[in-house]
From Swiss-Prot:
It is found in: Cytoplasm. Signal peptide: none annotated. FAD binds at residues 14-19. It comes from the Bacteria. Catalyzes the folate-dependent formation of 5-methyl-uridine at position 54 (M-5-U54) in all tRNAs. This is Methylenetetrahydrofolate--tRNA-(uracil-5-)-methyltransferase TrmFO. GO terms for molecular function: flavin adenine dinucleotide binding; tRNA (uracil(54)-C5)-methyltransferase activity, 5,10-methylenetetrahydrofolate-dependent. Keywords: Cytoplasm, FAD, Flavoprotein, Methyltransferase, NAD, NADP, Transferase, tRNA processing. The gene is trmFO. Residues 436-447 have a biased composition (Basic and acidic residues).
Amino acid sequence: MTSISIDQPIHVIGGGLAGSEAAWQIAQAGIRVVLHEMRPIRMTEAHRSDSLAELVCSNSFRSDDAANNAVGLLHAEMRRLNSLVMRAADANQVPAGGALAVDRDGFAAAVTRALAEHPLIEIRRGEVDGLPPADWSNVVISTGPLTSAPLAAAIQALTGEDSLSFFDAIAPIVHRDSIDMTKAWFQSRYDKVGPGGTGADYLNCPMTREQYDGFVAALVAGDKVDFKDWEKDTPYFDGCLPIEVMAERGPETLRYGPMKPVGLTNPHNPTVKPYGIVQLRQDNKLGTLYNMVGFQTKLKHGEQARIFRTIPGLENADFARLGGLHRNTFLNSPKLLDSQLRLRAEPRLRFAGQMTGCEGYVESAGIGLIAGLCAAADAVGRALTPPPPTTALGALLGHITGGHIETIDAGPRSFQPMNINFGLFPPLTEPPTHGADGKKLRGPEKSVAKKQALSARALADLDRWIADAVRVAAAA
């Protein structure tokens, strides 16, 4: 790697998914990087190691279907931009039906190793407990949902904005050999085959109507973690609701959510349709650990063990990790950040990852990727044109930095975190109306064709952007 002669390195604060990706992109552009990570000097309430890019919640990067799914499209775009996160994910994938899931320890180790071995990256362990020094002229702040209190307070004082917060919950992990396979079975929903998968990638635990009703009642009645006074009004992110909160919304809610009994047949009793099904997904490459899909929870640990062992097949479950809560903090990005993710009040500071209001592993890494490219371009005195809004990266960036609706029905509307989805993309100029066979598209076929057209447009536009903007900026 050829180093570009610049007096000051770029500082990246936070070694999660976004910070790791940002540091990688900057270094790959030939610019020195100092990556600051406070762990293990100071740990968070959710992390368990000092690894960079540690996955705290699920081990799933969600769908890898670039033609039909927005997050799969985001995967494809990041791969085209030589994403370290996607490279490590692909190298450490585990079977997960149509999803891309990873061995979390192998993934974090791969990212950590790549960054530690890069000649232009210096990793500094220690907390940055306030605004970066004035002589740090180019900074990416990617400290994530668990930003330390001193740094969060300094950012709040600088911006004059109250931080917005919500809670994410973490799902339990079970040792595979403690699951009773006379009751559970392997099958992906609708036998779908995904990257590294076979169509039989999930463990399924069936419930009768009586078992389901008793389970829901136990979730609602179980003892939960108490909130501190300052936490009581903090909402949950809808994409990561605790299982018991979903249960409180109605007795049938879980049957239309993570416990839906569709696309699966119990080989132990094939003529009887389960009333509800609990799925577990492989969590490590060895296949020794499985996480409970959609079972993030704020139940107390004793209650988790008691209630989850009433699930058929999990009566003797040995839990490698029980569920828990962690708090997320993010900026009012449309108001505070420009299109380059720079803080309007102090442009030397750029933000990336979940702090900006994107939600999800891949989304955080994607925004880290863009922040890294922008910071590298700034370092050589050349602004990088943002990716087109027709791409997944551009659509997500647009939501964060300006696509948010400030008012609705003459009232204020708060900025909330967002996963990538096709609703963020500009509509097609000419939506598909007929299939390859010439027949008029209707219903689900029309929806599928629209998604495929959006994806095809995105990848074509991304390729042009890489050629016209990224390579030009890199050559400056």
